[in-house]
Amino acid sequence: MTHPAPAVSETRTARRRPSVVWSVLALLLVLPVAGLSIFRAVPVEWPLPVVQLLSFTPWMVLPTVLALLLAVLGRRAWMVVTSTVLLAAQLFWLFPFDAGKAEPLSAGTPTAAVKVISLNSEYGGADAATIVGLVRDNGVQLLVMQEFTQGLEDRLRSEGLETLLPQHLNKPNDDASGGAVYSVFPLEAEGQLPDTPFTMDVTRVLVADPAAGSKATLHLTNVHTLPPVDDRIAQWRSDLGNIARQAARPGNQLLMGDYNSTYDHSEFRAVLDSGPDGRKLVDAGTAAGARFSPTWPMEGPPLPGIVIDHMVTTPRISSSNYSVRQVPGSDHAAIMATLSIPAG
């Protein structure tokens, strides 16, 4: 006497077990990604832990891809759909087509090309020889530094930086508030942003491009916000608000440095939305598709890298050859690009 039914039932149960396991694993990956995605999608002033977690949003694409693969193996349609929607959101945020882009200039508009670099030197600890090498090897014409100290200034002078970039406006300080601008072009101090613990100087750079026979005026802000940690998060938001007000001013604006924020923070995106006449500013790194080219931390704790150093311009300025370069002695990477600045 045979009993085929139980055998079939046992086979189905055996097949169902791995399907359930894959689905559970997919769910375990989906839940935290979905939670962070809600915070990312809603632009409000989130509390400190959420603000810090949002910095790592780009990395969420990896568990989302894995969740989708597990959902397919688990053969749960609702899980496949959920994972697909989450993956689409991560890709949209990773490569945002609604981000600010450089505006095309009218035919015949003269422009001046400038090679620029920015570096947070981490309390002046960055290797001076590497900095000077980057300037020399890449033909850099404008260098901006944060956390600039007297010791770093002395080492850079010994390495010959002032021969390459003879114009400079420096405010060295042994705490994190120091800053410096080195240039081949004449520099004029315009002031500084108000009510910021770290000095954020505004400098007029009188750019000239002999090859193109053009000149342009660039208003440079050396950005260094307080980080969003402990009770300093309110000042971080205030600093970004001050930067936004500067960005709304007329003329060619370059706001470059350590924002201590990523594109995934609504506070930073609010800065990008504050361009003159309501136009969007351009984050050169985001425009170059470099959201997976972290600028911090280059040293120290083994955290997933994030992009907190930015080169932000008004939309009439275009950028090319954006890159991130590591500098020994600093936990930040240097960011570098060539800017095309309209005359005027």
Task: Give names to the regions the model predicted.
Residues 1-16, 44:
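Terminal targeting segments of Actinobacterial cell-envelope proteins
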Residues 14-29:
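N-terminal membrane topogenic signal
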Residues 25-70:
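Membrane-embedded alpha-helical segments of integral membrane proteins
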Residues 38-45, 72, 91-101:
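Transmembrane helix-loop junctions and nearby membrane-interface residues
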Residues 69-77:
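Structural signal for the C-terminal ends of transmembrane alpha-helices
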Residues 81-137:
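N-terminal signal-anchor transmembrane helix
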Residues 116, 122-136, 145-344:
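Soluble catalytic domains of enzymes that build or remodel membrane lipids, polysaccharides, and related
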Residues 141:
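Short acidic/polar active-site loop segments enriched in Thr and Asp
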